[in-house]
């Protein structure tokens, strides 16, 4: 296909559970990408984790050939995108490789906040957005209401939105037919020098770095020498090809196409995502606009349970960072937990997924400390520093002002649940900025402290609205706030990994709850264990795990009271000595207890 008019590059924008992976499965079936024997549900979600949780985490690409009713055969390059708020950067990368996007909306539930945010990203990048109403076979489908919502919330014309049901296959052909007419063909010159954008890369132990690319201009084939623009290094191409979704080698990749390039790059940072590839003999080709780097919003310490695993842990993180460019990490040491890494994540789900991937794919046992956000600290000498670890907070005497990150949150919620959602936002110290009543739903915009949002806000929002509310948030600014560091002392010793930065008003309550929670989780020892919560030098809460005690009087039958007293005194002295030298084992659950404290 030397002519680009046959190519259509598109991705699907949809909220979690609105059926985009199922729709992708139908496309693959109809275009004969896989035989019936190889077909399985959620065929693009290749990670076990994605299947179990029913969410898409990574962007995947598939090239399909579709014979349309006008007699032409089109090459469809479809890039799957995640729908969860934590993986927005994956979406913007996928969209950079497309000319159009399908906005898939559940005809029963209507528009969700996350789809709105991704849809705006697509429109900003100049993509043609085509609305599709899915799950039309369900009795609760209300196509007219949902069309109205798409028009009033997102502002795109939805009068001729295609209605389909990905599960039953109804209307999927109409979606494909509309797609080839609505979405424009890519622009590009096959004869021009090579320009290819790296959308994604991952590390294969046998092949080295595998890069998923969108070719803008030119062509690339096996044996070509390619230049990575950011590193200036030259590599020889071992193979190029496409996913159908099987790994299929082709003779070359041309302008407008999406496929993979393997060039035997062994250095993990050899082909960064968002970089431009060109041929060695045309090194002065312009760099394509990449993606903006996303800043992590949540930081947590990850430590291997056994210190022997530290090197393996570092290798695993390096390989994972290649595949997930938003993960950041730096070495950290803790008195309580030894050596590990301070990692930055986009949100709590991202953190859970990374931890699970490390444990599953790389067979590591890890302990995670409580996540925190980044605080801006203005010191008395005028210097501004950023702190992502409570134990690194400078002495309070040297701090002029502490500022916490505020995010702008957009919440879409049905009218019936509006009261509960507003109560939750007020409890989380939110300030209402705006409210729009739409047909059936209300859009509320709040400024909320990031600290309150990242921990459990998403879960609480879902439970107070019975799962109907949806949330999208983005960092807005830093704002001065009355913050303090809450330390946890066990037997008079501070445990650095348990420190938290909290708002002063919430501190006594948080401290009490944390201490009670720790009391349940720390196993009883042979001596009393005192658990205290402190702000600076002031203890604000205390609890004691009572000692186990052996009945030393069991062998005295009757007898003199002084004999009994002697045995009890001896036991007491032994316990006192033990308390001075004994150390308390803190289980992993205790570190996570910090999360479970309802603020």
Swiss-Prot record:
<keyword id="KW-0997">Cell inner membrane</keyword>
<keyword id="KW-0342">GTP-binding</keyword>
<keyword id="KW-0547">Nucleotide-binding</keyword>
<feature type="binding site">
    <location>
        <begin position="134"/>
        <end position="137"/>
    </location>
    <ligand>
        <name>GTP</name>
    </ligand>
</feature>
<dbReference type="GO" id="GO:0005886">
    <property type="term" value="C:plasma membrane"/>
</dbReference>
<keyword id="KW-0378">Hydrolase</keyword>
<dbReference type="Pfam" id="PF00679">
    <property type="entry name" value="EFG_C"/>
</dbReference>
<keyword id="KW-0648">Protein biosynthesis</keyword>
<comment type="similarity">
    <text>Belongs to the TRAFAC class translation factor GTPase superfamily. Classic translation factor GTPase family. LepA subfamily.</text>
</comment>
<dbReference type="InterPro" id="IPR038363">
    <property type="entry name" value="LepA_C_sf"/>
</dbReference>
<dbReference type="GO" id="GO:0045727">
    <property type="term" value="P:positive regulation of translation"/>
</dbReference>
<keyword id="KW-0472">Membrane</keyword>
<dbReference type="GO" id="GO:0003746">
    <property type="term" value="F:translation elongation factor activity"/>
</dbReference>
<dbReference type="InterPro" id="IPR006297">
    <property type="entry name" value="EF-4"/>
</dbReference>
<dbReference type="GO" id="GO:0043022">
    <property type="term" value="F:ribosome binding"/>
</dbReference>
<dbReference type="InterPro" id="IPR000640">
    <property type="entry name" value="EFG_V-like"/>
</dbReference>
<dbReference type="GO" id="GO:0003924">
    <property type="term" value="F:GTPase activity"/>
</dbReference>
<dbReference type="GO" id="GO:0005525">
    <property type="term" value="F:GTP binding"/>
</dbReference>
<comment type="function">
    <text>Required for accurate and efficient protein synthesis under certain stress conditions. May act as a fidelity factor of the translation reaction, by catalyzing a one-codon backward translocation of tRNAs on improperly translocated ribosomes. Back-translocation proceeds from a post-translocation (POST) complex to a pre-translocation (PRE) complex, thus giving elongation factor G a second chance to translocate the tRNAs correctly. Binds to ribosomes in a GTP-dependent manner.</text>
</comment>
<dbReference type="InterPro" id="IPR035654">
    <property type="entry name" value="LepA_IV"/>
</dbReference>
<dbReference type="InterPro" id="IPR035647">
    <property type="entry name" value="EFG_III/V"/>
</dbReference>
<dbReference type="InterPro" id="IPR013842">
    <property type="entry name" value="LepA_CTD"/>
</dbReference>
<dbReference type="Pfam" id="PF06421">
    <property type="entry name" value="LepA_C"/>
</dbReference>
<feature type="domain" description="tr-type G">
    <location>
        <begin position="5"/>
        <end position="187"/>
    </location>
</feature>
<dbReference type="Pfam" id="PF03144">
    <property type="entry name" value="GTP_EFTU_D2"/>
</dbReference>
<dbReference type="GO" id="GO:0097216">
    <property type="term" value="F:guanosine tetraphosphate binding"/>
</dbReference>
<keyword id="KW-1003">Cell membrane</keyword>
<feature type="binding site">
    <location>
        <begin position="17"/>
        <end position="22"/>
    </location>
    <ligand>
        <name>GTP</name>
    </ligand>
</feature>
<protein>
    <recommendedName>
        <fullName>Elongation factor 4</fullName>
        <ecNumber>3.6.5.n1</ecNumber>
    </recommendedName>
</protein>
<dbReference type="InterPro" id="IPR004161">
    <property type="entry name" value="EFTu-like_2"/>
</dbReference>
<dbReference type="Pfam" id="PF00009">
    <property type="entry name" value="GTP_EFTU"/>
</dbReference>
<dbReference type="InterPro" id="IPR027417">
    <property type="entry name" value="P-loop_NTPase"/>
</dbReference>
<dbReference type="InterPro" id="IPR000795">
    <property type="entry name" value="T_Tr_GTP-bd_dom"/>
</dbReference>
<dbReference type="InterPro" id="IPR005225">
    <property type="entry name" value="Small_GTP-bd"/>
</dbReference>
